[in-house]
A protein has these predicted regions:
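Cap/lid segment of the alpha/beta-hydrolase catalytic domain
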Residues: 126-147, 155-162, 171-179, 388, ...
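Beta-propeller blade signature
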Residues: 105-109, 166-171, 213-224, 271-276, ...
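Asp-box/WD-like beta-propeller blade repeats and closely related beta-sheet repeat scaffolds
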Residues: 118-140, 150-155, 159-196, 200-211, ...
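Blade-edge beta-strand/turn elements of extracellular beta-propeller
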Residues: 119, 170-182, 224-238, 274-284, ...
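Non-catalytic accessory segments flanking enzyme active sites
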Residues: 44-143, 154, 242-303, 308, ...
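Polar, glycine-rich mid-to-C-terminal structural blocks
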Residues: 214-262
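Active-site-proximal cap/loop segments of hydrolase catalytic domains
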Residues: 496, 502, 509-710
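N-terminal Sec signal peptide cleavage junction
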Residues: 19-21
Length: 710
């Protein structure tokens, strides 16, 4: 079969080369056979490519040491255990060398604050997988409030987004005998009561949207067969986004509300309130999200202006509406503003405690957390928690039975830590810090700005050695994402620190348009046919690094995944002169067929659609797969993906690599067989992928004699 694949590849060579010589994009597609995720021919091609890449990267004298360091850090016993409040205790999911798939465990707050917490195992996924001969990967839990004793556990086959759901009792630590069980699927669920849940899933074959997500919500009672579940809401098969989803909010006073979110596009959705006898649509902007509830007031995070209150509430703000009023008059909500960010601010998240709100705010890409409380006249006061400055901060979890919250603090050179906050007093204290993984004293962090092609100032962080000589010789990795209003903020990354910074490398994170660093407007500036500004921003940062002699094209590498993988592909084809290494992670690359591959149709709101002529023309102009040129001098990229990725899919990466092969262009390709939309299903697989990446960067950007120093 391998010979058949090789023969077909070379038979297509002349066609590919001929098409690749035109000035415009090459819209031919001779590698659709690689779109079969698990097809025999496709998998044989994958195995051949994996073996070829292994002979290059794993044979490098640096690889073994890099892999060992990555695995040791991934499985270290003194890693920081992040926890969440559940039933009066703290729960954590943990993986190490003895628990490859992981254990779900718990401890008390007092014990967690000690140097050596006493953990009780609630569920051992390794033991469960062995007993059931299943390839289980933990995907989380949803526990019924109040009490939080009964939980719906999500278990995935190999890391896919699709999962199996089973009810579990955390007190007895057993699956519930008459519990809820939902077979494998992309599904959404919400507790209505201890004996009733709402479920959105593919009830009958084909009852999914174009993107493969559910659009029908049914009520399922304990002991009731799936076939007998009662439909309460139906969207449409033509809906965009990520599927119709139910969600239940409960506050400390016992107020309870179940909502249904119906996505119409990637960023727009209708919000509905489940009432005793019907499901009523709420008068909330389509670009907004219901996020929590406190004291009978429902929190909404806005990406569009909301009118209807005393004054218009701007996009990017946080607002509330009264639940009791919504139950009476869902179509005439009167919102109150809680917080409206300034021009260089954004809201990263909102959480409720018993009677306070915690707002995660970024000011010029620096984090802080504000405690908000409501006065009797409806005004809100905000007090910052006393947290470190010039770092990233965020709320990990809150306890609605009290005013406690767990807050994360992290920075490029600041080991991640957990802080315990008291929202009623607006105080916070560090209670757990991860052990340093690299010598941060050798490095320094700067925040700088580049000027994009249209004059926009684009901030970026640069982490470099103390006393760095600006002579263009510094090996540099530039990272960005640039899409979906996702913010890239400073964080302590042990792999980057140990495997790159300690080895003398420079790391750069760019806050380009398309992200959410400065609110919805920063994101919307790069939507659909306006997307070229995202790529111009990234190139501007690279050119600034070169102009200031931090690095040079010979020493500059770039990295990005998923939508960031598309960014990498565009930079690879538009500006091959700027880079000597391009790490393309789980990417989108065929932008003329992305709507037909996996969940791609759900992202039309971000990228546009080939069904719209203007948008198709733009997509063709940027699509990396269609803009490869035979005879062009490209750097050798590392392209990697995963077989089990049922979100973006491995098809984009496979086809891009195959086309490069047919054109006689140098490349390295690796496909992880498990792991979903990520680097692997367990620590060993993830460490292997990480080692391949940093070995690749060392080969491309550092001198051959430069050895890895553990």
């Amino acid at each position: 079969m391998r010979h058949l694949i090789r023969s077909s590849r070379y038979a297509l060579l002349a066609v590919v080369l001929a098409c690749g010589q035109s000035d415009g994009p090459d819209i031919s597609d001779n590698f659709q056979w690689l779109e079969s995720m698990h097809g025999d021919s496709a998998m044989a091609w994958v195995q051949t490519e994996n073996a070829r890449t292994a002979t290059v990267l794993e044979a490098d004298p640096r690889y073994a040491s890099i892999y060992k360091a990555a695995l040791d850090m991934a499985q270290a016993e003194d890693r920081l255990p992040y926890v969440s409040f559940l039933g009066g205790e703290l729960y954590n999911f943990w993986q190490d060398s003895a628990h490859v798939r992981g254990i779900w465990r718990r401890t008390t707050l007092a014990s967690y604050r000690s140097a050596s917490p006493a953990w009780t195992t609630v569920l051992d996924i390794d033991s469960l997988a062995r007993a059931e001969n299943a390839n289980w990967v933990w995907q989380g839990s949803d526990c019924a409030r109040p009490g939080e004793r009964r939980c719906l556990l999500m278990l995935s086959d190999g890391g896919e987004d699709a999962n199996t759901v089973r009810e579990f009792d955390v007190v007895s630590r057993t699956f519930v005998t008459d519990g809820f069980v939902l077979p494998k699927g992309k599904q959404r669920l919400a507790w209505v009561s201890l004996d009733t849940i709402l479920v959105s899933r593919e009830w009958e074959a084909g009852e999914v949207t174009t993107s493969g997500y559910p659009f029908i919500v049914k009520r399922l009672a304990r002991g009731q067969a799936l076939a007998d579940a009662v439909e309460i809401y139906r969207g449409s098969a033509t809906d965009g986004g990520y599927g119709v989803s139910p969600a239940t909010l409960v506050d400390a006073k016992g107020n309870r509300a179940t909502f249904i979110d119906r996505p119409l596009s990637t960023f727009e959705s209708e919000k509905h309130l489940v009432r005793a006898t019907d499901v009523a649509q709420l008068s909330i902007p389509r670009k907004a999200g219901i996020v929590d509830m406190v004291d009978g007031r429902v929190l909404v995070q806005l990406s569009a202006e909301w009118t209807g209150g005393a004054a218009p509430i701007p996009a990017g703000a946080v607002a509330v509406f009264d639940l009791a009023a919504a139950l009476r008059e869902p179509g005439t909500l009167v919102p109150e503003v809680v917080f409206a960010p300034g021009p260089r601010e954004s809201v990263a998240g909102v959480s409720a405690t018993r009677d306070r709100l915690l707002l995660s705010i970024y000011q010029n890409v620096r984090g802080t957390v504000l405690v908000a409380s409501r006065a009797a006249d409806g005004t809100w006061t905000r007090t910052p928690l006393p947290l470190p400055e010039n770092v990233s901060t965020g709320v990990i979890d809150t306890d609605i039975t009290g005013n406690q919250a767990l807050v994360s603090v992290t920075g490029f050179l600041t080991p991640s830590s957990v802080w315990l906050a008291d929202a009623s007093a607006a105080t916070a204290a560090e209670i757990k810090t991860m052990a340093p993984r690299f010598d941060a004293t050798r490095s320094v962090v700067e925040q700088r700005e580049a000027t994009s092609k249209d004059g926009t100032k684009v901030p970026y962080f640069i982490v470099h050695p103390q006393g760095m000589v600006r002579d263009g010789s510094n090996p540099t990795i530039l990272y960005a994402y640039g899409g979906f209003e996702a913010s890239m903020t400073p964080r302590y990354d042990a792999d980057i620190g140990k495997l790159w910074l300690e080895q003398g490398g420079v790391y750069v994170m760019a806050n380009i348009r398309g992200g959410g660093e400065f609110g919805p407007a920063w994101h919307e500036a790069g939507l659909k046919t306006k997307r070229q500004v995202i790529y111009d921003d990234f190139a501007a940062v690279a050119e600034d690094l070169i102009a200031t002699e931090v690095t040079s094209p010979r020493r500059l590498g770039i990295q990005g995944g998923s939508n960031g993988g598309l960014l990498m592909g565009v930079q690879f084809t538009q500006r091959p002169d700027l880079w000597n290494a391009v790490d393309i992670q789980v990417p989108l690359l065929d932008m003329l067929r992305f709507e037909q591959i996996q969940a791609g149709a759900s992202w039309v709101g971000e990228y546009g659609s080939v069904s719209v002529p203007e948008e198709r023309a733009f997509l063709a102009s940027i699509s990396p797969y269609h803009n490869l040129r035979a005879g062009t001098k490209y750097p050798e990229p590392l392209i990697w993906t995963t077989t089990k990725d049922d979100r973006v899919g491995p098809q984009h990466a496979r086809k891009f690599a195959a086309k490069m092969s047919a054109m006689g262009l140098p490349y390295l390709f690796h496909e992880v067989i498990e792991g979903g939309h990520g680097a692997g299903a367990n620590a060993a697989q993830q460490a292997h992928t990480t080692a391949l990446e940093f070995t690749y960067f060392a080969r491309q950007l550092m001198d051959p004699e430069k050895q890895f120093v553990p």
